[in-house]
Amino acid sequence: MSKVFATFGARFARLTLCTIGFALICWCQAPQMRTRYLTSLTNTEIEEYLKRNDVIFIPVGNVEVHGGFPTDCEYVGPLAFAQKMAEEADGLVLPNLAYFFPGGTVVGKGTIYITPSEGLPYLKAIARSLLRQGFRRQIYLTDHGPSPQTLSPLVREFFDETKDPILYIEMGSLMRKAHADFNKVLFGAYSVVGRLDDIPLNVTQVMQEHPSDPGLNKLQALGPGSGAIGAYFGDPGEHGGLAKPITAEQRAQFAKEGVAMIDATLKVADVKGIVQAMRDHDKFTQDVILPKYGNILPK
């Protein structure tokens, strides 16, 4: 009889461990969804999501000349990161925010020019709407040097007005930590969002002889990207490199390597840790800072 109980006890212990292990796996994995794109979900699906979480990733881009890539490549890059981040952290993605400040690339006729002061109110209106809808954890993503001129005022002013600490991540800094090749990441990004064929194979770009600005490099190094001094590129070919023909096989290989670099960047980023840090920071603000200093803080 004791052997029977011993056998039963061992089996019960194994079953219990398996159950606990399965529960931990489920807890660590984000729930499956039909899509993470808010614009592809029904209102019912969005409201069901908001019952369990409040995280949304907002890729913000620009449309500009960029060598052999489509002009929206610096929107597609953050979009791919947002999609993967949302899958990892159980968030949603708000797409289609592609038209913001490009910087000095306005010399290319494919560049759409919106100033930071024009883009900021639009983003702030979206942020307010998202907060009212229930998205308190808003994470804005860019991969474009001049973007901080629009996004940094957004997160600072929105926090002062609402006391909701939304976050801005410039993906370039994270990619550098992961030693990622920026061009290959773009190939990978188009693959992630299902648009790899949008990168052309047989485009050749020629840059005409033109003078270079003798003082620009010294001056631009004195401040943040495009924020130290106003300037324009001397030729569209100076931004993104010159387009060169590639084969379909090369494009597929670059995309494969780029996706791996995106994944490596996300590992460095620790997306779940970022979201938890936002919750901790928000709680500290609400529980400690506001009760102590609320009467003198900006309204």
Which residues are covered by each model-predicted region?
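N-terminal secretory signal peptides that target proteins for export/translocation
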Residues: 1-11
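Sequence-pattern detector for short linear motifs
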Residues: 6, 14-17, 254
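Bacterial N-terminal signal peptides
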Residues: 13-26
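Extended, histidine- and acidic-residue-enriched regions that form the cofactor-binding/catalytic faces
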Residues: 29-91, 95-104, 108-114, 121-139, ...
